[in-house]
Amino acid sequence: PFDEVEAPEERSLWLEADFHFPELLKEDDNATVAPHFAHMRMDSEDGIPRVRYRLEATMGLAGDIEETLLYVLDANEEGVALTTAPVTRHHRNAIQMHYLPARRDPADHITYGANALLGRLLRAVDWELDRGVVQELTDKISESLSSNVSIKAFSEILSTTWKGLHRGTFFSDPKLTFITSEIESLLRHMSVSFTPGHDENLVDFSRLSDGQKSMLYLSLVLSSHAIGRAVLKGESKAFDVKRLKPPSFTLIAIEEPENSLSPHYLGRIVNALDSSIGGADSQALIATHAPSMLRRVEPEHIRYLRLDENRVTKVSTIQLPEKDGDARKFVREAVQAFPEIY
């Protein structure tokens, strides 16, 4: 707090989030209800079932943080949690959040996130029919490289030196190997590359600009979400649903994209999110200081956050006339024409 005189030995924080299940109003089959059914609650007889999550965390003077994720099973009239239950790792993975940071050099975060996404997809692929072909090809590559005169000479000297030091039965003959025949080992070296480049045909993604890396990460997230959605609906048989374990809900959070992207890219991001995200299985949040972003978002979806004199965040919405007409059209066009006012 801004008026704090002495730092306490421990700070505490809690956050709660409600997830509603409007798909229960329909009789269609879905993959989202079953994992959360045991923790669903209703606030009224005709209400929509929901699940409430509560994240509790404490931070010591040294900055070490302890956190706990809980289900809120019962709360009083003021919303204070009375009965809770821990969220298991299996249930935690049912909801995934992908975060695109605001800093201009997001390479570390994006590289880790991209590898995690690709790894999850590749582990869900059935490689059994390809193992024999891959092993045959990798053996040919190793034999071709090993037949080099210089490599042969070095291998002979290495073998002689090693045998003078090691007399055991096992590990008696060292060889230079260049490539593994196991598919899982090969996949660890997989990367995303682009063609064509300015000075070479194949360009690794590490050479992209900060903005391009951000767009690549978003592309991977949206692609992964599309695959998971298709697998859950039974529209795709290319991945093993038990290995892929698609989340029942995906949240994409983008912080101040104007920091690393040119203005003309912002519209493309919003369009990509509009076409891929939505419905009962996904949601996207964009935090921004750029008024131009408001032109690309429906006024009903805009939330304005501001600190009051006590440094408590107040959330405001744009009030639109209830019925469609000239008044509603006027307010909507005013937001898009003069977003800096809002």
Predicted regions and their residues:
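Extended helical coiled-coil dimerization/tether regions that scaffold
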Residues: 106-113, 119-252
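Loop/turn-to-beta-strand initiation segments
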Residues: 96, 248-251, 279-285
